[in-house]
Amino acid sequence: MQFFSTRDHNRVVSASQAIAQGLSDEGGLFVPQSFPQVDVKAICALDYPEMAAAIVGQYLTDYSQEFLQEAAKATYGAAFGGKAGYLAPVSDEVYSCLLYTSDAAD
């Protein structure tokens, strides 16, 4: 997938170049040229690291799926119990997503 600058739509780069560069030369953000559709039923059947790799892989097409899966497992593996975070109730209808690895939320 290619990414274009928000300040110059003719400035198009690969995902890896957008990540390495951060901002485009003229100070714009890099955004994807399209937003892939996700099969919700299929994606929900995956564990969190697999889900993350599958979704991110649709945007970072110049990285191998194997690399993305290993990165997702390393990021969301044992330290997170395979989850992205913990939803803690704040009130009856409000929850906060805790994004740390402490077991204090258990």
Residue ranges and their predicted role:
Residues 1, 11-14, 77-84, 104:
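Short amphipathic alpha-helical surface micro-motifs
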Residues 1-26:
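Charged, compositionally biased N-terminal leader segments and the immediate start
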Residues 26-99:
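Small-residue-rich anion-binding loops in enzyme active sites
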Residues 100-106:
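Conserved small/polar residues in nucleotide/adenosyl-binding loops
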